[in-house]
Swiss-Prot record:
Catalytic residues (UniProt): H11 (tele-phosphohistidine intermediate), E89 (proton donor/acceptor)
Pathway field: Carbohydrate degradation; glycolysis; pyruvate from D-glyceraldehyde 3-phosphate: step 3/5
Protein's recorded name: 2,3-bisphosphoglycerate-dependent phosphoglycerate mutase
Organism: Buchnera aphidicola subsp. Baizongia pistaciae (strain Bp)
Gene that produces this protein: gpmA
This protein's UniProt keywords: Gluconeogenesis, Glycolysis, Isomerase
Length: 232
């Protein structure tokens, strides 16, 4: 049976991951550990014979730089790379930039876990002025203001990720294009929820590790068979 493989990967550890802060759409770079994670992932991909025709990332530099490190190591810097805000991390609203332990102390662990892990519940919103500032960012100034988020639940994240998968990435993948997607914990959770038909309760338990390639296998009809981490 013919098997088609897609590579998904969460960016390497970011500076704010290291500092235990909510990051979301804030554009922070990789930590030193994150750089090493991306290089380790590149070595694993090379060891297992993975090479690519096309790559996708978000418009956030922790995703972009992870991808750069991988394709540079694979000597594939020439392949087309498409960046989209639709692959961005979930927008954590007013929590962005705050230390997670401080937020737990203020709101309680149960509430914070609802914000972080549930499918439907969104964290507190940013202000209108903060959203206007976001809308003036050159990465987002061509997007309808009403579409830009004040905050996002995983459900809202899914609603922006899936159209990009269905209309852009999947049609290219169906042409037997070898693709790598470097994105974020929650944008990947959204995609995996769809691909594996995970229900709204079970998705609470899905966590995506930084820096490890996820290999997604599809059959000849491009139906998902299984996915697994490439760790050795």
């Amino acid at each position: 049976m013919k098997v088609y493989k897609l590579v998904l990967m969460r960016h390497g550890e970011s500076i704010w991951n290291e500092l235990n802060k909510f990051t979301g759409w804030h554009d922070v770079d990789l930590s030193n550990r994150g750089v090493q994670e991306s290089l380790k992932a590149a070595k694993l991909l090379k060891k297992h014979g993975f090479y690519f025709d096309y790559a996708y990332s978000s418009v956030l530099k922790r995703s972009i730089h992870t991808l750069w490190n991988i394709i540079k190591f694979l000597d594939q810097s020439w392949i087309p790379v498409k960046k989209s805000w639709r692959l961005n991390e979930r927008h954590y609203g007013a929590l962005e930039g705050l230390n997670k332990d401080d937020v737990i102390q203020k709101y309680g662990n149960d509430k914070v876990q609802q914000w972080r892990r549930s499918f439907n519940i969104a964290p507190p919103k940013i202000s209108y002025l903060e959203k206007k500032k976001l809308a003036h960012d050159s990465r987002y100034n061509n997007i309808n203001f009403d579409i830009l988020p004040y905050c996002e639940s995983l459900k809202l994240t899914t609603q922006r990720v899936l159209p990009y998968w269905l209309n852009e990435i999947f049609p290219r993948f169906q042409k037997n294009t070898k693709i790598i997607i470097v994105a974020h914990g929650n944008s990947l959770r959204a995609l995996i929820k769809y691909l594996n038909n995970i229900n709204d309760i079970d998705i609470l338990n899905l966590n995506i590790a930084t820096g490890f390639p996820i290999i997604y296998e599809f059959n000849s009809e491009f139906k998902p068979i299984q996915y697994y981490y490439l760790k050795q």
